[in-house]
Amino acid sequence: MTSALRLAGTLIPAMAFLSCVRPESWEPCVEVVPNITYQCMELNFYKIPDNIPFSTKNLDLSFNPLRHLGSYSFLRFPELQVLDLSRCEIQTIEDGAYQSLSHLSTLILTGNPIQSLALGAFSGLSSLQKLVAVETNLASLENFPIGHLKTLKELNVAHNLIQSFKLPEYFSNLTNLEHLDLSSNKIQNIYCKDLQVLHQMPLPNLSLDLSLNPINFIQPGAFKEIRLHKLTLRSNFDDLNVMKTCIQGLAGLEVHRLVLGEFRNERNLEEFDKSALEGLCNLTIEEFRLTYLDYYLDNIIDLFNCLANASSFSLVSVNIKRVEDFSYNFRWQHLELVNCKFEQFPTLELESLKRLTFTANKGGNAFSEVDLPSLEFLDLSRNGLSFKGCCSQSDFGTTSLKYLDLSFNDVITMGSNFLGLEQLEHLDFQHSNLKQMSQFSVFLSLRNLIYLDISHTHTTVAFNGIFDGLLSLKVLKMAGNSFQENFLPDIFTDLKNLTFLDLSQCQLEQLSPTAFDTLNKLQVLNMSHNNFFSLDVFPYKCLPSLQVLDYSLNHIMTSKNQEPQHFPSSLAFLNLTQNDFACTCEHQSFLQWIKDQRQLLVEAERMECATPSDKQGMPVLSVNITCQMNKTIIGVSVFSVLVVSVVAVLVYKFYFHLMLLAGCIKYGRGENIYDAFVIYSSQDEDWVRNELVKNLEEGVPPFQLCLHYRDFIPGVAIAANIIHEGFHKSRKVIVVVSQHFIQSRWCIFEYEIAQTWQFLSSRAGIIFIVLQKVEKTLLRQQVELYRLLSRNTYLEWEDSVLGQHIFWRRLRKALLDGRSWNPEEQ
């Protein structure tokens, strides 16, 4: 009970203390850059936190219920440069709220329902360049106390309640102002007096955005003799007549860039006619843009005759029913046609045009030749265009072209190697369908080309000279293509200045060891999304400048032959993530290298084992492989291997002896067919036939002999016949010894088998017949035979009649030994 009371006595004061502590004193802000940038977004702060370093330069306090900013609210942050107070429910800003922020350049007050703004609210902001006061309930610029902000360059007061366009007198102090955004306010009328300050203090660099204001009237002369850098009027007019009248009210304006039209999701005009733009002839315009008009314009050329002297002309999301030739009458240097609809590709003949952007348009899918002698920049991407013979000077009518983008189009047939376009520096074909790329050296004349992208162009590289001539190329992107037999050959021979190479998604499985030998300046190489099963280091040893190598999303299990340490010393980033690493003892050295090179590898923690199954999904860095076996297991394994080896050797050496043993077991004491199996040399066959066979088989009693030339079964191995037909079916064995016998391997083999047969069979007997005198030196070569003849009796063949009589009598007696007697044989 006492301990419980003590615990309660401790917890109650602690809880009371915590309830009094403000969240800002213990909720941590996110430290983006130590001591520099802090994000304190949505932390429910009611006041400026005091636990942020004095050195902070960027502070985000958005979405906190601060509600009230008193004087010197940010005294603790004298180094502050960017302050975001978006949607902090601020209603009151007192004098000197930002005092001491002399280095602040950007202040964002978006979405605060300000009701009380003191005259000195922005005092002390001597370096402020950007002020964003969007959605702050601002009703008039007249009462906005910013006249002293002489360094201000950008003022954004969009989405407020401003009804009058009158620019206050203090604008004459804002001599550095470059951008004024008044879009989405309530301005309906513009009078001459509203712009009086711009007559007194011209701001020729000012960009003015009046979009999404419901303008009904612009007093003629209001903009007369006023110079602006940019004027934007989009989705301002409810009908065509108002638009026509207001554009006429702009008469006398000198503007560098004029933007007219609507927004994609803010359409006010129900109809459109080219007459609405006739008032443009009374303006001096350097660059003109017309955006988002869904209505088909018929014959727009005469519409823009008054813009013939402009330097830039742009149409975005405009439907054009019919267009006559863009002829030499126009002095445009830049023509932009984006996301428009054409019935056919326009005919372009513009002598002064240097830049043409014709992208994401619909209709007119077949490219037609143009005549643009001064053209340097050409973007024809995302149009679905088809080219029957690309590319040469005759296609574009220029020899000055430096930039050509034909990406995201249809079929482009390569019919020329860019004759007349030798000045090209940038060439992009990505995601177009290129034909005839590997039939000749397409880029041979492009010695000045720096950038080439042929990614995903259905190209199959079958010609090693495909990149010949690209001596200045620095960037080559060819992802998503293929190579013959999925093998990368030596195709980069001329690319000695290449620094970036992308070979991802090319289905590569192998590469030539010398594929990169000439790329001494290569810094970035992307080999990801291919089908490599091992990391071959050798091809990269010749890349002294290589810094980044990406081998992610392959099927790499281990390194190939070479040690991974042989990568160039310049390599700083190696990406091997999402591969099929084999975490087994076989690849232990490679896995250890991965752990040792953790600082070199990109996202090494994402490298996971694919095999074996029990380690699948485990991080390679943390996997632990035990590759040491138990000593007992090793000993037993070695002993087993030795035993098996010895048995195998013995079986091999005594195979036929074992066959004989198996036969003895199988046939047992079965009846013999032959009285004797004769072993002799083929060179003694005459004696065997004329003497031995004749006297024994035709004599009394007759004996049945087994002779190989007569009794062996055809189609059966000789050794099998010797064992099965000779030994197993005979009572005795007659060995005819001669010099030829001793020198014959087969005879010696049969004799050795006969010895085994005699040992295994108790009834067996070997009868030796010495056919002729054998030299002892020759006989001693067969040790066992020599010993047997020395210790046992044998028969000798003699030429005398008496000797032969005795020979046959002794031989018959030996053969009759063990034979059952049959009286019918006499």
From Swiss-Prot:
PROSITE patterns: LRR (PS51450), TIR (PS50104). InterPro entries: Cys-rich_flank_reg_C, Leu-rich_rpt, Leu-rich_rpt_4, Leu-rich_rpt_typical-subtyp, LRR_dom_sf, TIR_dom, Toll-like_receptor, Toll_tir_struct_dom_sf. It comes from the Eukaryota. Disulfide bonds join C29-C40, C281-C306, C390-C391, C583-C609, C585-C627. It holds the Pfam family LRR_6. Coiled coil: none annotated. GO terms for molecular function: lipopolysaccharide binding; lipopolysaccharide immune receptor activity; NAD+ nucleosidase activity, cyclic ADP-ribose generating; transmembrane signaling receptor activity. It is a single-pass type I membrane protein. Residues 672-815 form the TIR domain. LRR repeats lie at residues 55-76, 79-100, 103-124, 127-148, 151-172, 176-197, 205-225, 227-247, 374-394, 400-422, 423-444, 448-456, 472-495, 497-518, 521-542, 545-566. Keywords: Cell membrane, Cell projection, Disulfide bond, Endosome, Glycoprotein, Immunity, Inflammatory response, Innate immunity, Leucine-rich repeat, Membrane, NAD, Receptor, Repeat, Signal, Transmembrane, Transmembrane helix, Ubl conjugation. Residues 653-826 are cytoplasmic. Residues 1-23 form the signal peptide. Residues 24-631 are extracellular. The chain crosses the membrane at residues 632-652. Phosphorylated on tyrosine residues by LYN after binding lipopolysaccharide. Transmembrane receptor that functions as a pattern recognition receptor recognizing pathogen- and damage-associated molecular patterns (PAMPs and DAMPs) to induce innate immune responses via downstream signaling pathways. At the plasma membrane, cooperates with LY96 to mediate the innate immune response to bacterial lipopolysaccharide (LPS). Also involved in LPS-independent inflammatory responses triggered by free fatty acids, such as palmitate, and Ni(2+). Mechanistically, acts via MYD88, TIRAP and TRAF6, leading to NF-kappa-B activation, cytokine secretion and the inflammatory response. Belongs to the Toll-like receptor family. The TIR domain mediates interaction with NOX4. This is Toll-like receptor 4. It comes from Papio anubis. The gene is TLR4.
